[in-house]
């Protein structure tokens, strides 16, 4: 959530900055009207409180003199009733302002390129050279069928479209990938591993920005005979980041770096007809998430570090990729700056997103009231939060199957994964 004081004092300027966000126009008139109502009711509340306090003192003095105070008491009671009414009106207006503020995206950083969609993203660099095959390249679906490791028909039978069953050595590689990523991030990059719930409450989803705006992208669950509604996590970013909700952290304990391997669940609303073949876009997929909680002045530096750590996974797997700086029209709702890492997919002859690394600035921290305080300082300040995929396990599996395929349909196991697969070098029929 944007700083309400900043929004209040610089409404036109912020509205102009947010125009570059795809599909968003800040309703300046509505916000201005609500602000005027807030100011009027705030002044009225303070005036009534002052008058009531003054009248109460008058009652005390009159009572001490033995005077009749019944009329004064009636006036104070009337003021109290009026004050309660005004307070209720003020609370309603403040709720409206907050609900409006919760739908406003983050302000892009100055260095973020202007643009409408992904065609305006800026390529930063490419790493590795796509392999040239001397045989006809198969996609991961065909390779999975040859090896008996990807069963999309079973996924449809069990659950429906955009689900799959992964079996045998392909399932083993899928597990090996997650273990390799976790070991890299915990042993070399300084992250602490976390195991978190896959079901979260609405307060948690508000904290990281999925609600109220993106409820249709979630799977919601309401157990029988239970009033509590949950949602399946769309990413481990949600529970991991919320671990600092309502906390005041000693600045000496920052940065906090956490990683988690979880399944992720997304309804893929609005993506009908896109990537209907294979593992690229699923309702359920695994991901290793990276989260950092940092001091405000260090968040841009932390974004570079976090992105480099996600890149290291691709480099160790020797998978060609490119790094892209997202434009204003393609960034996520809560991000101020985002890098995407796109891995080479031979059968599609293109790069596809495998990681998105974002600096959320104080956007999530304000929603969560996650703060830090320096030693000896009474004042607190909001932390900055960052997150990124390190990496999406299913898409990494896709990239390995296609980039490491052989003419007979077998798959060469990347060297760094072999210790996790009992030394297996080739996955064959």
From Swiss-Prot:
ATP binds at residues 266-268, 353-356. Keywords: Aminoacyl-tRNA synthetase, ATP-binding, Cytoplasm, Ligase, Nucleotide-binding, Protein biosynthesis. It is found in: Cytoplasm. Homodimer. The tRNA molecule binds across the dimer. NCBIfam families: serS (TIGR00414). Catalyzes the attachment of serine to tRNA(Ser). Is also able to aminoacylate tRNA(Sec) with serine, to form the misacylated tRNA L-seryl-tRNA(Sec), which will be further converted into selenocysteinyl-tRNA(Sec). This is Serine--tRNA ligase. It comes from Histophilus somni (strain 129Pt). The lineage of its organism: Bacteria, Pseudomonadati, Pseudomonadota, Gammaproteobacteria, Pasteurellales. The gene is serS.
